[in-house]
């Protein structure tokens, strides 16, 4: 048997910040201990699981699929083809032009070329509708799994909850159960209508409730059944995540409320981590995620000979490593080998689309950002950006082009998916920014609904939230020191029970009137379908406009005359959203001049008193005006301030 290579301890990527938990000890007590040394050479062959998540159509970016295939082939030649599995934890088929223009089919074809064994649906696998989702699953060679994706009409699961794979032979044979867990956020993070019948009744579900118990019970039933079927190890493929995710549905919450899972290969939140949270019996479970867009490849090794589980990388790769004397955890971030056949296959698919995607729409003098400077963390979900301003302005302009004089335009931060770099702006670039082909629409709605929309979108700040609204025609302030009291029963908006965090809302320079009706333009995902659980417009009648990426094209060509210019130069936007962690300080009154004392009448010539210099009444009036002006100026600056 081949020895496992020793892990490395190398510096992290500049864009990656691993949590303190990920840097903690990874030691596991008893039979589920991590190996701190190379696995023993004798005994059963190690079981290697290479994993990806949230690739989002990044077929040749960062590591890319061609390098992934070469890496997997190297592992198979090292440890034996039958001992290596390739799995994906969701959100592979949507996010860029290749996905949008082929409804995800080219991405499934590439995954087939890579040789994936098992996969689970992320929320974005459903973005093309349920019919197309079923087409993609049928097209895939990988087996899809889920223990909680349910047909509510029958109560049956849509996929097998788990599948069993045997490793080794004879007395050394081991069974590994691969189990799928979908995020219940799928109901609102994809298009809700995909899961409803024509009457709007939900006919599919993901074991969602307000406590998390339905999900935990579904997972536990599947784990118990897998153990009863003889599983020696249970590996969960989970599209759950942690940061910015509904707390009861995070991977750590699922681990804390279940038992019997050995490994959680996670996704959804686009984070890099390797952790060992405790399950409900106090036993540590390996939870690992590799970020997004193939910035990393994960690898888990189960060594039956020593009964250990290790998440680490091969000698052949540089690694992001969390290591102590008791354990190691790593994510592969660079790899030199490329599978030529896979690379050529991807180039061929891209060439077929190039005549569409490479059409130049205009130019940009500036960089427009959806991501922070690390090109990894979502900026548009945490604060205003110039790209958020640009997209919202384009929505509003599209309505105006159609003769609809809308007051405000909104776009959810989660719907803005890529930066625009200076230089030529192509059709493919704009599809990457808005890959969903959402239909725009407008609605006459109460100001109260607009206030509730802003409040719900800002409920997680300063943590990111895909429902944060980027705006046009409107400015607002968020006070993050005020606890959010937004109610989201079942993941949908249920009202605000306390003080609003959102305030100082101005529509075209005038305070928002909660009792007045405004014309608002956005997309059907928000207004009609209640995406992100934002259902406050369900009683308003929407009027359809054009597609979201069509709005961007028209805005560049007609309103901006072909060039995105200096008005969008500030990456932080134009001061439409102010995020504060406390109230503005009270303005300091301007110092007042002391009135001159009255003269001594005896000192005046002829015994007469001297006249006063100045008019104290007039001085007091001037001082009051100055203080009021200073207060007004301070308030104006505060509204426009950014963190």
Please annotate each region the language model reported:
Residues 42-48, 52, 57-58, 69, ...:
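Catalytic centers of hydrolytic enzymes
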